[in-house]
């Protein structure tokens, strides 16, 4: 399944420490939830800067920056080479493949890859349904969402770093419109085993492949949920009820709490989810 990109510029500016803090808080919940913070390579970083940061993009948090993530998608999903992924596939003998996205524009002096990333950083997070969000049922459902433990992984709120902060190994200066912003992505950006694993580890570069994460997935951000019908990584859950039913593994105890809600309480929680 394709991933939502709207608002990812804000996700990029979440402090690494805030994501790592989620690991500690989950351990304190004593529900068998044990998220993993992935160390992902910063492909655009220089040799003099730290080479890894906390991953947050991709189904397995295999990327830590939008530049790295977009470069990977161009190369491995569209077959378009670029400066971060300059090579052809070893199995292909082509020497005249697609031109890398690295030719600066005469006016902006930005490459196509840089313009693509800049465009994604400009996007706003999906807005909630304003009317449904203030309804009594949705507000009650939001409280239930937290009470039964859904919010342990689907963390609602972060504040982005200050404007002017240099992130991504110093390669990116956070602009004013992204800095000091309170956002509500509803994700911890950690990897979890909820029983739906595909057995495929993913990493930005082969040396970072970790077989222990093969059956784990990043907690899917829930903002914009109301615009999607086919859920989970494989799209095999037609709606939120079906997606909740597939939450096993680390999420088993929380799912059981949902199962024990009354029909009225389940309706309230579903109304909250429909407002996102």
Indicate where each model-derived feature is located:
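Periplasmic c-type cytochrome electron-transfer domains
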Residues: 1-276
């Amino acid at each position: 399944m394709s991933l939502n990109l709207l608002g990812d510029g804000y996700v990029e500016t979440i402090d690494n420490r805030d994501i790592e803090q989620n690991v500690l808080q989950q351990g304190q919940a004593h529900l068998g939830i044990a998220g993993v913070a992935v160390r992902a390579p910063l492909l655009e970083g220089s040799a003099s800067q730290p080479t890894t940061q906390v991953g947050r993009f991709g189904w397995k948090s295999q990327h830590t920056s939008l530049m790295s993530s977009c470069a990977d998608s161009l190369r491995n999903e569209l077959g378009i080479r670029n400066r971060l992924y300059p090579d052809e596939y070893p199995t292909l003998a082509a020497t005249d493949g697609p031109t890398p996205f690295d030719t600066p524009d005469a006016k902006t002096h930005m490459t196509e890859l840089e313009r693509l990333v800049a465009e994604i950083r400009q996007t706003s997070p999906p807005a909630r349904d304003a009317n449904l969000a203030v309804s009594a049922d949705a507000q009650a459902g939001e409280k239930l969402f937290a009470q039964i433990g859904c919010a342990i992984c689907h963390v609602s709120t972060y504040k982005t770093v200050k404007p002017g902060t240099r992130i991504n190994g110093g390669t990116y200066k956070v602009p004013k419109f992204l800095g000091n912003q309170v956002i509500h992505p509803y994700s911890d950006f950690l990897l979890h085993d909820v029983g739906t694993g595909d057995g495929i580890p993913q990493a930005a570069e082969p040396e970072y492949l970790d077989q222990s994460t093969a059956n784990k997935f990043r907690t899917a951000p829930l903002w914009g949920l109301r615009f999607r019908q086919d859920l989970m990584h494989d799209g095999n859950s037609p709606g939120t009820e079906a997606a909740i039913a597939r939450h096993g593994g680390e999420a088993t105890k929380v799912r059981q709490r949902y199962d024990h809600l009354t029909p009225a309480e389940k309706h309230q929680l579903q109304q909250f989810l429909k407002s996102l």
